[in-house]
UniProtKB/Swiss-Prot annotation:
InterPro entries: Rhodanese-like_dom (IPR001763), Rhodanese-like_dom_sf (IPR036873), Rhodanese_C (IPR022111), TrhO (IPR020936), TRHO_N (IPR040503)
Domain (Rhodanese) ranges: 159-253
Protein role: Catalyzes oxygen-dependent 5-hydroxyuridine (ho5U) modification at position 34 in tRNAs.
Protein name (Swiss-Prot/TrEMBL): tRNA uridine(34) hydroxylase
GO molecular function (one): oxidoreductase activity, acting on paired donors, with incorporation or reduction of molecular oxygen
Organism the protein comes from: Leptospira interrogans serogroup Icterohaemorrhagiae serovar Lai (strain 56601)
Residues annotated as the enzyme's active site: C213 (cysteine persulfide intermediate)
Classification via Pfam families: Rhodanese (PF00581), Rhodanese_C (PF12368), UPF0176_N (PF17773)
Length: 367
């Protein structure tokens, strides 16, 4: 890795593959051995990109030299990136983006909290869309987006009786943190969210709509979608929750966001407010700790307190805990569905199901 002040250069002569070739253990060890800090950030832009495959390969080669780790999606319609970079290479990375007109003057959303371990590898994928929305972009004007509001403006408009605050994230995100009095659609995906929004906001076309998401990208498409359906006063939080937290801190504003901000990297969350507004899905204790089930065949994301983590060995259900103690070959058979055709391993609204399972069955049997 290049030292601060040195422009990183590729020194090897052998052509390197333009994808990760190492396992998680090696990647984790490398990350732990780094003796410098990293900056976690995100950015996006809707912009027409040409020769996407060629661009993807160029970016991978250039960003690998800079030590970039993260998840980046590029498509004909633009780029969506969540990544970490050695802090001493941040200026070089900015210059790299600015060297392409499509990415010039990109706005970064810097993480509110950062342990320098948000990502293990560089994963740069070509997608049909940079956000999976299920929409036909030819059917409406995707550029006719809502008005962008600063944190101060967003707070002010929240006081308006005619305002409706709408969370444009999935239910497992809003569960651990959201704005006061916001509508919280119980969706698993952004595609589903857009359909639910029209149902929840039916008849409120003349209200002031205040939308927000993590970094702003989902609001771009959702606001245009609502305006297409006749909503006249559609607004969105500029830069999302991440930028809101920074502006509130810098200007000494009141934070109307309660709890934590869910993030799609190794951190899983970052503190915005001090409140814990969610509960353990297994015992009901106050908790906002997201984990993945330790059963490799499940790996579902759910909220688990330290006590239940010890009791269930990090698993979401007794079934998964039992699977965890089976021989490895038997576990593989289960994951393939050979021994469990009706298995419980599903991400679709699994989180509330876990809660219902434990409150409805385990708690009832203990009385």
């Amino acid at each position: 890795m290049a030292n601060q002040g040195d422009f990183p250069k590729r020194t090897e002569t052998k052509k390197r593959p333009l994808h990760n070739i190492y396992g998680k253990e090696i990647l984790r060890k490398r990350l732990e051995e780094e003796n410098f800090s990293r900056t976690t950030l995100s950015f996006y832009r809707y912009v027409i990109l040409e020769n996407v495959q060629e661009l993807r390969d160029q970016l991978y080669a250039e960003w690998e030299i800079l030590g970039v780790l993260g998840r980046i999606y590029i498509a004909r319609e633009g780029i969506n990136a969540q990544l970490s970079i050695p802090s001493h290479n941040l200026d070089f990375f900015r210059k790299n983006l600015d060297s392409r007109n499509q990415f010039k003057d990109m706005q970064f959303k810097i993480a509110v909290e950062d342990d320098s371990k948000s990502f293990l590898k560089l994963d740069l994928k070509i997608k049909k869309k940079i956000v999976a929305d299920g929409l036909n972009d030819d059917a409406f004007d995707v550029t006719n987006v809502g008005k962008h509001l600063s944190a101060e403006e967003f707070n002010l408009h929240m006081e308006d009786e005619n305002s409706i605050v709408v969370d444009v994230r999935n239910h497992y995100e809003s569960e651990i943190g959201h704005f006061e009095n916001a509508i919280l659609p119980q969706s698993d995906t952004f595609r589903e969210e857009l359909r639910i929004l029209l149902e929840l906001l039916n008849g409120k076309e003349n209200h002031k709509i205040l939308m927000y998401c993590t970094g702003g990208i989902r609001c771009e498409k959702a606001s245009a979608w609502l305006k297409h359906h006749g909503y006249k006063d559609v607004n969105q939080l500029h830069g999302g929750i991440i930028s809101y937290a920074h502006e509130v801190s810098q200007k000494g504003l009141e934070s109307k966001f309660k709890g934590k901000n869910f993030v799609f990297d190794g951190r899983l969350q970052e503190a915005i407010g001090n409140e814990v507004i969610s509960s353990c899905h297994q015992c009901g204790a106050k908790c906002d700790r997201h984990v993945n089930c330790e059963n490799p065949g499940c790996h579902v994301l759910f909220i688990q307190c330290p006590s239940c983590s010890e009791k269930f060995e990090g698993c979401c259900t007794l079934e998964c805990q039992n699977v965890l103690h089976l021989p490895k070959e038997k576990q593989k058979e289960i994951r393939k569905g050979k021994l469990n055709e009706n298995r419980f391993f599903s991400k679709s609204k699994i989180r509330p199901k876990i809660s219902e399972l434990y409150h409805g069955i385990l708690f009832k049997s203990s009385k």
